[in-house]
A protein has these predicted regions:
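Serine-dependent protease modules
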Residues: 1-116, 121-126, 132, 151-166, ...
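Conserved catalytic motifs of ABC-family nucleotide-binding domains
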Residues: 137
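Short strand-turn-strand beta-turns centered on an Asx-Gly dipeptide
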Residues: 143-148, 174
């Protein structure tokens, strides 16, 4: 640590999961009130059983340990570590769509019942979604068995899925649910 004090332990509680703080589009932080100081990012976040559940990453606050801390979940870190060991780089899945939120008004017009999923604003030509038959205006409701409640969930789930995997997308089109199979590409 920057102060030369080794073996320091702090305590706190997990106050939220699945936090996005605007650092990148692939965020899924654990929020904690444990004291995280300048320079100690990368330290482990433990649960009460002594298991590592995250890697301390960021703090929101003006000065040192005063604020809210964020940690990358250990399962997300493990995926990156495994890819770095195997390939020397990370490989993220890619659908090739630009998406936006499904508003209450859009849900009503589309007879969706409630606002959920990710509205496809555009499909990149030649992308996996283009090849798989996804169209502008489709609403992606489910990705490979995982329900998409809010638009921002989709990019993270896609990025964490293996490149080349064939996934099933449940899509709302013309006021009915259809299923499409897509072979994920690689995000460059």
């Amino acid at each position: 640590n920057p102060f030369g004090l080794g073996g320091t332990v702090t305590s706190g509680i997990i106050s939220a999961r699945n936090r996005n703080i605007g650092l990148s589009r692939y965020e899924d932080f654990i929020q904690t009130d444990a004291s995280i100081n300048t320079g100690n990012s990368g330290g482990p976040l433990f649960n009460m059983n002594g298991d590592v559940i995250g890697i301390n990453t960021a703090i929101l606050g003006q000065q040192g340990s005063i604020g809210i801390g964020f940690a990358i979940p250990s399962n997300s870190a493990k995926q990156v570590i495994d890819q770095l060991i195997e390939f020397g780089e990370t490989k993220r899945g890619w659908l090739g769509v630009r998406i936006q939120n499904v508003s209450k008004e859009i849900a009503e017009i589309e007879k969706l019942g409630k606002a959920r999923g990710a509205l496809v604003a555009s499909v990149a030509p030649g992308s996996p979604s283009d090849k798989g038959g996804i169209k502008d205006g489709d609403i992606i409701l489910e990705f490979d068995g995982k329900k998409i409640n809010e638009m921002q969930e989709l990019p993270l789930i896609v990025a964490q899925t293996k490149v080349g995997k064939v996934v099933k997308l449940k899509v709302w089109r013309n006021k009915k649910e259809i299923t499409k199979s897509i072979t994920l590409g690689r995000l460059e």
